[in-house]
Amino acid sequence: QRQMCIRDSDTVDGEEDWLLLFKNETHNHPTEIEPFGGAATCLGGCIRDPLSGRSYVYQAMRVTGAADPHTPLSETLTGKLPQKKIVLEAAKGYSSYGNQIGLATGEVKEYYHPGFMAKRMEIGAVIAAAPESHVIRERPQAGDVVILVGGRTGRDGMGGATGSSKAVSYTHLRAH
């Protein structure tokens, strides 16, 4: 996942140039397994990265996909949560995270299609801005020190995300 910066040609109050940052994440699988937490951390990840770059996150967007939430429980695929539970709990999770920090979500779009019965779509995105003076752009030099902070990383380079590729059984879902 990448952050994209756009140089703002205008100035704020005639004093300082700002950079715009756009960040998005998908949490399809985590939201399907645990809808509240999956959707909440989808937005959380979008917020975390620009904040770590000394920017101000000020707007969010959520785009999701689900099968018909009115699908009878008897038609829920084996090993899957009911669509209604996923839709309602994911909305609560995303909203909870954003509301706790006062982030406005200006655009929400949920697509309903039978194709989402097998795999949910959960996309979060934010817009952030940083004064240009907060961004230091230099080329790395031989001998520069790199400090890595964080938890252990899996072989895929993504740590906790390794769970999103694991097969999940019906027994696993019932246990959680």
Feature locations, PLM:
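Short alpha-helical segments and helix-capping/turn motifs at coil-helix boundaries
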Residues: 1-3, 7, 32-35, 42-50, ...
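Conserved small/polar residues in nucleotide/adenosyl-binding loops
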Residues: 2-8, 171-176
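Short glycine-rich loop/turn motifs
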Residues: 3, 16-19, 119-124
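Short helix/loop capping segments that flank catalytic or ligand/cofactor-binding pockets
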Residues: 12-17, 22, 30-33, 59-61, ...
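Segments that form or flank anion-binding pockets
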Residues: 22-29, 36-37, 43
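Conserved phosphate/anionic-ligand binding catalytic regions in large, soluble enzymes, centered on
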Residues: 39-58, 150-154
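Glycine-rich phosphate/pyrophosphate-binding loops
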Residues: 56-62, 104
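Hydrophobic, small-residue-rich alpha-helical packing segments that form membrane-like cores
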Residues: 68-174
